[in-house]
Amino acid sequence: MAAKIFCLLMLLGLSASAATATIFPQCSQAPIASLLPPYLSPAVSSVCENPILQPYRIQQAIAAGILPLSPLFLQQSSALLQQLPLVHLLAQNIRAQQLQQLVLANLAAYSQQQQFLPFNQLAALNSASYLQQQQLPFSQLPAAYPQQFLPFNQLAALNSPAYLQQQQLLPFSQLAGVSPATFLTQPQLLPFYQHAAPNAGTLLQLQQLLPFNQLALTNLAAFYQQPIIGGALF
């Protein structure tokens, strides 16, 4: 009887321990291997044997794959940095050679433009005409180049003497530019006596006698017949 009770207690204890026991499954290598990158070395797959060491081993494997490449990368970058000034210098030399070839190809035209263009645009177009213009006296310049030196009046380009006469008479009347003879007969220059234009001597006499007597303006003969008393005219 006692033996039966002891066996019953043993069975109850085993059942209780089986109910509270924890199952530890074996590590599966297939899912972990599928998560690893394909470019890692074959030694990385061996770290999956122990799940506790897996992150540490993976980190070591990645570092071992990158570190051998870093010196090569540093050497290439330093070489590129050293070559950049050489590239700039080469580009500057090529540009200078191109400019030199362009200047040598058009040396005559370049020298003419540099000498004459800042002073006159005519030198860039026709150097011979520019030299002739520089050698001409100042009095002959309007006749040789009327459009350049007399742009304010078109008459000077056609007839220089007529233009000079017009410039002398123009401040008094615009009619002088058309007909100088008609301009002299106008009352603008003879406001005191209308008939004095044909005779300048009579005009001067009238200008002298005008402040004393108005009779000289109408009848010169009657004015001379007037008696002179005390130096005054009546």
Swiss-Prot record:
Keywords: Repeat, Seed storage protein, Signal, Storage protein
Keyword DNA repair part of the UniProt annotation: no
GO MF assignments: nutrient reservoir activity
First and last residue of the signal peptide: 1-21
InterPro entries (alphabetical): Zein, Zein-alpha
The keyword Lipid biosynthesis belongs to this UniProt entry's keyword annotation: no
Positions of transmembrane segments: none
Stated family: Belongs to the zein family.
Role this protein plays: Zeins are major seed storage proteins.
Other facts noted in the record for this chain: The alpha zeins of 19 kDa and 22 kDa account for 70% of the total zein fraction. They are encoded by a large multigene family. Structurally, 22K and 19K zeins are composed of nine adjacent, topologically antiparallel helices clustered within a distorted cylinder.
Xref: PANTHER family: ZEIN-ALPHA PMS2
Protein name: Zein-alpha A30
